[in-house]
Regions:
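Non-globular, low-confidence helical/coil segments that flank catalytic cores
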Residues: 2-8, 16-300
Length: 300
């Protein structure tokens, strides 16, 4: 019963919150103006971010300090079982939220077996529809399981953990292209900022720069490192220390494009790819630990 109440509360909050709503601003202010003791407590827990190896596709798992779990995309269909196995290895038998960034099959295909086999409290979607069989199968499985399905709004906050700010910087409303409709998330825990770009392209980057602060320590590079994303101007505004490139080895698309890799190198950004292994990160809000690379202080 407690779990059901939590889901209903989250759904009602998401339906009400938007960038300009007074309730959203009060909610976020309560997070960032907490008492000194409360702010100290938030750093006792860690936020864990796993950029999963799913071949030519995208899937990111986030375990928040309060234990809530959020999966962002699931890779292609054949990666679904791989993701499920990874969740089991981490002791996860339930997902509090799935974020479906946009309807391309290399992002939502793997969500089909995940939704079939694992309890999910809520699915957050870009709002972009598509005519593909993969998309219709995905939606039908959600309906069959009776999982709440919400299209997010730009500027909206996703209140899964009171100590973590998760803001939507882009959605699929009124967007023609699937990639342009990608949900973009900025996640902040303490001093640690993660910017997850989905398949957002340069046009989306330009729009985001007009509205939001994009500075982040970790940039999940847009569209698998394609030349259509990650402009010079955008990199300068984000100023990341670390860049994650999600792609499969020997993929037919040439991802990541050498022009993007070159730009990231020129800015001295440390790059990690999911082509060979899952990239694991942890942060206490003060430092970031990357796999076996050890503790990395945040440069603020």
């Amino acid at each position: 019963m407690r779990g059901i109440r939590s889901v209903l509360l989250l759904v009602s909050v998401l339906l009400c919150f938007s960038l300009n709503s007074a309730s959203a601003k009060r909610y976020m202010m309560s997070i960032h103006t907490a008492s000194p003791l409360h702010m100290q407590r938030q750093h006792f827990g860690k936020m864990k971010v796993s950029f999963l190896k799913v071949g030519q596709g995208d899937a990111t798992l986030i375990i928040l300090p309060n234990g809530q779990t959020m999966l962002i995309d699931g890779g292609p269909y054949e990666a679904g079982e791989v993701v499920i196995q990874k969740l089991i290895e981490k002791g996860i038998n339930h997902l509090d939220a799935i974020v479906s960034t946009h309807p391309d099959m290399d992002h939502i295909g793997g969500l089909i077996p995940i939704v079939e086999q694992m309890p999910v409290s809520l699915i957050l979607d870009s709002g972009k529809t598509y005519s593909s069989l993969t998309y219709h199968t995905y939606r039908n499985h959600i309906k069959k399981r009776g999982i709440p399905f919400i299209s997010v709004k730009e500027g909206q906050y996703i209140p899964l953990d009171p100590h973590v700010s998760i803001q939507v910087l882009n959605n699929g409303k009124s967007k023609d292209e699937n990639n342009e409709s990608s949900i973009v998330l900025k996640i902040r825990y303490g001093k640690a900022d993660f910017l997850l770009m989905g398949d957002a392209d340069v046009r989306t980057e330009t729009e985001i720069l007009k509205q939001f602060d994009v500075h982040a320590d970790v940039l999940k590079v847009g569209h698998h490192g394609s030349y259509t994303s990650t402009s010079e101007r955008f990199i300068k505004k984000v100023e990341p220390q670390f860049a994650i490139l999600s792609y499969g080895s020997k993929n037919p698309y040439g991802h990541p494009h050498q022009s993007v890799v070159r730009r990231l190198k020129q800015h001295g950004i440390m790059m990690y790819g999911t082509n060979k292994r899952t990239v694991e990160m942890e942060t206490d809000g003060e430092h970031i630990t990357i796999g076996s690379s050890g503790l990395m202080p945040l440069l603020k």
